[in-house]
Amino acid sequence: MQNEYSQFEQRKRDHIELALMPANQSSELNPFDHFSLVHEALPDLDFKDISIQSIRLKKKVEKPFIISSMTAGHSNALEINYRLMEACSKTKWAMGVGSQRRELTDKQAAFEWAPLRRDFPMVSLFSNLGIAQLIDTPISAIQRLIDTLQAEALIVHCNPLQECIQPEGTTNFQGCWTALEALVKKIASPVIIKETGCGFSKNTLLRLNNIGVAAVDVSGVGGTHWGRIEGHRANKDPIRHRTADTFRNWGIDTLQSIRNAISLNPSFEIWGSGGVRNGLDAAKLFALGATTVGFAKPMLEAALDSTGQVLTQMNTIEYELKTAMFCTGSRVLDDLKEKACP
């Protein structure tokens, strides 16, 4: 068991380093530059009256942004997460926590979040579990993860490509739909489904809508590509390493994933992430129908520096979003839905 924990910690440290490498970004597939908003030369509004309030899990929120789940369970994570949570406490951004998988077998692992929760009790946090762990974990244990964190909801991460390439990957997803449906019916917290950079098809989204998930974070191609990251880690495994290269462009991009969801007129909220680098990208997702937008890599880069850098990044993104709204004549986020170029 100790070897498993050491392996887990090393993998999480590897992920931090590799996620920042340009080669592991699918930016050449990023669709945002091919989608435009309609410019308004005479916006009949005052910039200071622009509101970026949104609805998240049926509640009004001041900021429509979430820091996507990134890291936990290793020695460097505490400082990174402290800076992220400190910034969230000042800006009212939400935050997804890193993997809580280890907490299922190591009771001490939960204490990683205890001091952060104590210092920043008002930050809206979201629990994190992978779909492979969901299959054979009792719902009572999952609820305990959420309650210990005092989380708003649970984000279940789907990452089939990553698991195929990862040297330690878990590739038994059999029973995932049955487990997910049972979770949604029985757990006391909202359930959000999130991809990890490969997006969602219309058929999968339809099934998710039918079982009643609260939200789907589409997380499409265009940003950090976990298949590429695991390919770097599998450099001593020629089969996995070559497979990673074969699938380096695999997935459905973020904008198409949002369109797939919108076309269903779903009961779940649509969240957008995957290659979102600035406030203009976020504005385009809101224009398509997203209600929450997630950022990962830009926040990780800032958090490796300081809380101040995270705050600067957040404030810049908010200002960029408001600039996009001003230049399209949009006073509230819903107005952006009329400003997408046909």
Curated annotation (Swiss-Prot):
List, alphabetically, the Pfam families matched: FMN_dh
The listed locations are: Cytoplasm
- Locate the residues binding FMN: S68, S69, M70, T71, S99, N128, K194, S219, T224, G275, V276, R277, A296, K297
- Annotated substrate binding lies at R11, K12, S99, Q100, R101, Q162
Q: Which cofactor(s) does the record list? A: FMN; NADPH; Mg(2+)
Q: From the UniProt record, give one GO term of the biological process aspect.
A: isoprenoid biosynthetic process
| Catalytic reaction equation(s) | isopentenyl diphosphate = dimethylallyl diphosphate
Q: What class of enzyme is it?
A: isomerase
Query: Which InterPro entries does the record cross-reference, listed alphabetically?
Result: Aldolase_TIM, FMN-dep_DH, IPdP_isomerase
**GO CC annotation: what is one?**
cytoplasm
Print the keywords alphabetically: Cytoplasm, Flavoprotein, FMN, Isomerase, Isoprene biosynthesis, Magnesium, Metal-binding, NADP
CDD domains, per the entry: IDI-2_FMN
List all disulphide bridges recorded for this chain: none
Q: What is its EC number?
A: 5.3.3.2
Report residues binding Mg(2+).
E163
Q: GO molecular-function annotation terms? A: FMN binding; isopentenyl-diphosphate delta-isomerase activity; magnesium ion binding; NADPH binding; oxidoreductase activity
Which domain of life, per UniProt?
Answer: Bacteria
The UniProt similarity line reads: Belongs to the IPP isomerase type 2 family.
Describe the subunit structure: Homooctamer. Dimer of tetramers.
Function of the protein: Involved in the biosynthesis of isoprenoids. Catalyzes the 1,3-allylic rearrangement of the homoallylic substrate isopentenyl (IPP) to its allylic isomer, dimethylallyl diphosphate (DMAPP).
Q: What is this protein called?
A: Isopentenyl-diphosphate delta-isomerase
> What is the native source organism of this protein?
Legionella pneumophila (strain Corby)
